[in-house]
Structures are given as C-alpha cells and as structure tokens.
Swiss-Prot record:
Annotated transmembrane regions: none
Name of the protein: Co-chaperonin GroES
Highest rank taxon of the organism: Bacteria
Biological source species: Actinobacillus pleuropneumoniae serotype 7 (strain AP76)
NCBIfam families named in the record: PRK00364.1-1
Chain's gene name: groES
C-alpha cells in the first residue's frame, strides 16, 4: 500500500533509539523513550495559502528530521511498519 500525503502533511518513519545507557545497561519500559527523529518518506504538495497559491515544503524525501510528537501526530501501520503522519509545522529541525 502506498500513502500520498496531502497539502502540508509529511510521512516519516521513526528512527530507532539506542536502548542501552552509556554504561551499557539495557533500558526498558519507561526508561526507554521513543525517538523523536525520523526519516521523511513522503511529502505533500505544499501549504495552501490564503490567496490560493501553494507554498512548497522545506523538507524533502530522504531528510532526517527532529519532530514534536504531540497532538496532531498520527501513527499508522502500513504493510506491517509504523509510519507517522504529521504537519510540517510539527517538524522542529532537519538533521544535516
């Protein structure tokens, strides 16, 4: 199945977070946090402006980003893999 995001929506795949502490202890449960980094796998056509024009998104497929995981971030399973659907406004930075 293929997802094609609309407007200013971005689809990304969460990057795995290190599950060991600096001292080598395996983190589980509440100590193991979910990563807020992800790789962009699809982008919408752009943000629709009030005058009817479309502003292109700043992120592109392949970018690794840091995002704000909060209200408005939708998690979906597609072909057995978790993907996140969010607005470009929820992206805080591009990792270069």
């Amino acid at each position: 199945m293929t997802l094609r995001p609309l407007h200013d929506k971005v689809i990304l795949k969460r990057e795995e977070v290190e599950t060991r502490s600096a001292g080598g202890i395996v983190l589980t449960g509440s100590a193991a946090t979910k990563s807020t980094r992800g790789k962009v796998i699809a982008v919408g056509t752009g943000r629709l402006l009030e005058n009817g024009s479309v502003q292109a998104l700043a992120v592109k497929v392949g970018d690794v980003v840091i995002f704000n995981e909060g209200y408005g971030v939708k998690s979906e399973k597609i072909d057995g893999e978790e993907v996140l659907i969010l607005s470009e406004n929820d992206i805080l930075a591009i990792v270069e």
